[in-house]
Design a protein with these regions (language model features):
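Short, well-ordered beta-strand elements within core beta-sheets of diverse protein domains
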Residues: 37-43, 60-64, 151, 261-264, ...
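Conserved C-terminal structural/oligomerization subdomain of aldehyde/semialdehyde dehydrogenase
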Residues: 33-38, 225, 262, 317, ...
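Residue-level signal for inorganic ion chemistry
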Residues: 34, 71, 93, 116, ...
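Terminal low-complexity tails and localization/encapsulation signals of metabolic enzymes
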Residues: 1-40, 73, 77, 125-152, ...
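Structural signal for hydrophobic packing residues in well-ordered secondary-structure cores
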Residues: 56-59, 63, 79-86, 90, ...
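Rossmann-like NAD(P) dinucleotide-binding subdomain of oxidoreductase/dehydrogenase enzymes
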Residues: 127-271, 399
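ALDH superfamily catalytic-core signature
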Residues: 235-379, 403, 408, 442
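Glycine-rich loop-to-alpha-helix module at the N-terminal edge of alpha/beta enzyme cores
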Residues: 35-126, 136
Length: 461
């Protein structure tokens, strides 16, 4: 593994790079090597106050005076420059997150760029209405920016989820304060640099780094912030709801999941096997919509699980910077320990380990690598069937018929995504309508489009 120089590692406030007011920093660690690759500021209240003031001034000043079409052009240029710098940005994403460079370079950076370019087209298509009312009066509505928006971003898709929040906010005329996860701040800082290069006015995009427990909390409670857009775990989302209540901020929450991948015996089983493995092992399973529960008809369960396990055993983790690697490093030591704890709990509760189950060594003796892990014989009350692990750990559960498949799929506090595998299109749509999930895929998994909504039921936000 070769090193990449990290050029931007300060706060970005009002178009300027600066250290935190208190001078404190936090380490950014490459999870594949366990080496510190950067130190970034740990912001304090004074830094957040400065970012809010800059965002408010830009909203009331140069950004607010731009026409919608001019604003859209700038948002488009951000996407354009992301693509132009895709190699550099993808490398940063892999270095601080541990995901394979193939995913960063060929999937996630292009998807982030597409997000900016998609929403750029919306900037001049947001209209008010003229309302017919009685009497000799003219009544009309305007759609106005919410104001200063804080985007609190998790560590699993640092760039892409930043784009999901920032692009629509900018297109609608808001200004933004980005709070990346403390483990993965580098691509948010790179994005701020790109925005400045294309001419986005100072104060429109600000980046504040530091721990969520302190910096994130101060952002949530700040009276000068009008809206919070958060992606992360459900418990943190609940805390944000409580913290935002005192100032009655608008919030959007995209939270956890325990998504079922449902395989019926009449499915294309080879395709379903591929879908079951990519559904859980893409992104190392650190995906809110990961297909972490595999529900299989009992008539095919044994052979099907054997084939999924055989495929998983061939997916050895590797150097994330190797273009051939398809399974990278777990994002942090803390997350690896969390994954291993769940694996031990599954064993203790009687689940049958059929693949993986331990740390992996890619030959360096370093790095937070985990074997792709599959448990068979999982029952709905087991911990790994109910709690979000957020790692490459699959729980296989059998069902007897369509009704039991639906009941078991819905037997969760989450409802972000699901998939149905069958050649019977009538059955597919019947099941999809009864599933309590924001996104339901049929005979595929992990297909996203910027034009499609992405939300959930229950505690998925």
């Amino acid at each position: 593994m070769t090193m990449t120089t990290v050029t931007r590692k300060q706060l970005f406030i009002n178009g300027e790079w600066r250290d935190a007011a208190g001078g404190k920093t936090i380490d950014v660690v490459n999870p594949a090597t366990e080496e510190v690759i950067a130190e970034v500021p740990s912001a304090e209240r004074a830094d957040i106050d400065a970012a809010v003031a800059a965002a408010r001034a830009a909203l009331d000043g140069p950004w607010g005076r731009l026409s919608a079409r001019e604003r859209g052009r700038l948002v488009w240029k951000i996407g354009e420059n992301l693509l132009a710098k895709a190699d550099e940005i993808a490398r940063l994403e892999t270095l601080h997150n541990g995901k394979p460079i193939f995913e960063s370079r060929h999937i996630e950076v292009p998807a982030a760029a597409e997000c900016f370019q998609y929403y750029a087209g919306w900037a001049d298509k947001i209209h008010g209405e003229t309302v017919p009312v009685k009497g000799n009066y003219l009544t009309y509505t305007l759609r106005e920016p919410v104001g200063v928006v804080a985007a609190i971003v998790p560590w699993n898709f640092p760039l892409l989820l930043t784009a999901w929040k920032v692009a629509p906010a900018l297109a609608c005329g808001n200004t933004v304060i980005i709070k990346p996860a403390s483990q993965t701040p580098l691509t948010a800082l790179a994005l701020a640099e790109i925005a400045a290069e294309v001419g986005v006015p100072a104060g429109v995009i600000n980046v504040i780094t530091g721990p969520g427990s302190s910096v994130g909390q101060m952002i949530v409670e700040h009276p000068g912030i009008d809206k919070i857009a958060f992606t992360g775990d459900t418990s943190t989302g609940k805390g944000i709801m409580k913290g935002a209540a005192d100032t009655l901020k608008r919030i959007t929450l995209e939270l956890g999941g325990k998504s079922p991948n449902i395989v019926f015996p009449d499915a294309d089983l080879d395709a379903a096997i591929r879908g079951a493995t990519t559904g859980i092992f893409y992104g190392k399973g650190e995906v809110c919509a990961a297909g972490s529960r595999l529900l299989v008809d009992k008539s095919i369960r044994g052979e099907f699980i054997d084939k999924v396990a055989a495929r998983a055993k061939k997916m050895a983790p590797g150097d994330p910077l190797d273009p051939k690697t398809r399974l990278g490093a777990i994002s942090s030591k803390k997350q690896l320990e969390n994954d291993l704890r769940y694996i031990e709990v599954a064993k203790q509760e009687g689940a049958q380990l059929v693949a993986g189950g331990g740390r992996a060594d890619i030959g360096t003796g370093k790095g937070y690598f985990l074997q792709p892990t599959i448990f068979d014989g999982v029952t709905p009350e087991m911990t790994i069937a109910r709690e979000e692990i957020f790692g490459p750990v699959l729980a296989a559960i059998e069902f007897a018929d369509v009704d039991e498949a639906i009941a078991r799929a819905n037997d969760t506090s989450y409802g972000l995504a699901a998939a149905v595998w069958t050649k019977d299109i009538k059955k597919a749509h019947h099941v999809a309508r009864r599933l309590q999930a924001g996104t339901v895929w049929i005979n595929t998994y992990n297909i996203y489009d910027t034009a499609a909504p992405f939300g959930g039921y229950k505690q998925s936000g």
